[in-house]
Amino acid sequence: LKRPHALALALLTCGALAACSGSDAAIAPENFPTWSNTQVNLVSRTTVGAGVAALTSMRADGALETVAIDLTSGKKLWAQPATMAGRLPGMGVQAPATVETAPDQGVVVALDPAKRGKWNATLMAREARTGKQLWTRPVHSTFGPQRCGKFVCMSEHTALANARMIVLDPLTGKMLWKMPGIAEVEWADDQHVVILRLAANPVVEAYKLKDGKPLWQQPVQAALGNGVDLSGGWAFGVAGDRLVGYIAPYTHPKSGKTSTFGMFSIRMNDGVIDWVRPSVVRVYPSGNPAVSPVVRPVDDEGTYGGFARLDGSTGRVMGQITATQVPGSGWWLAFPSAMNTLGFLKHNAPGTAFDLSSGQATQAKGVRSWSFCVTDPQPLGKAAAGFFSVASLCEFDLATGKRTTEPGAPPAWFTGAQNGWRLWRDEKGALHGIKDATTTLPGMYG
């Protein structure tokens, strides 16, 4: 499991952790470029490169397709059939990998349904703007391709004993190097890649991208202690020169024992552990682990504490409320865009709010907040049976618990930004974009 998304999967310990969040995002001024594309039913994250946004969409017949969209206009450039072969439902629907190969030139790499013999799918690379096929590679099983700097990384044969991670040239498909085992890319630039090795004893590792030379290794258990199990899910983000990781708890169905969990930070230049927050669970929606994580501590008896917002750079508490301040049940978390207020949203009923800096109760009146549009999401069917689409946020008036009539764009801590563009899915699956940022920022989904 990987990036759980919606309430059974995304709220990593759902029942006791029912949580949500929000923002005071204002309606965008007219001078910000903005668009909507209702031709797609977005079910994956969106990747961006060379002025193109690529995503996985679900067609009306339940089949998946890879769609490329012009980032400036929101217009669909092309669409081709897509599939998954061996990806785990808790990881969410696979997004295409988008790699920029030159200014305004890029490659979109995705899994095509074409089968041949023992191969269950075909990895296919296409020109980002035209959809022209560049190369293919047969696939038995994989969690899907990822961009790693200027290359494509993918773990293949994931269902077999000879699983390995491969690094490919995006223009030719030539294998540059490989290593045994299954890994996920957590960060890369043009020279280095940092991966999470998915194993019984997971390890964060760094390599030189051009030749695979190992740079450093750091076992996750060195940060959090023994008993880590990735089955509960995980998430990573980058704050400056630090990689911040979150490992979720997993309760074994037979033994009832809960695995080790918490957050930690690693220096990317040498792999040294920077800070650790053991035994905290991340709540949803909230910011990327490296930017504005919101967590709840859990004691040895499994009792939840209050809520705390952490500084992703240092791990320090920036604001918190105690367990005794948490109001009963039936609420969803809500935050303004600055995340300085912690709100408890009740649908169609008055909510409550706390000033995070002081921990004191504050007025809910006038607070517009964002929460999951759907609190009981249904899994996708057909080609993505058991999977959930990425979540959508809706804006609510915290004082009444009702939706607002003119919501703006969801907050940046949720959407993130890619080259200044913020992209998000509405509850019907349409993709929206606005260029109101100036840089690239990680969002809730990375």
Q: Model-predicted segments: where are they?
A:
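A motif-centric signal for short, conserved binding hotspots located
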Residues: 7
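Secretory-pathway ectodomains
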Residues: 2, 10-14, 20-446
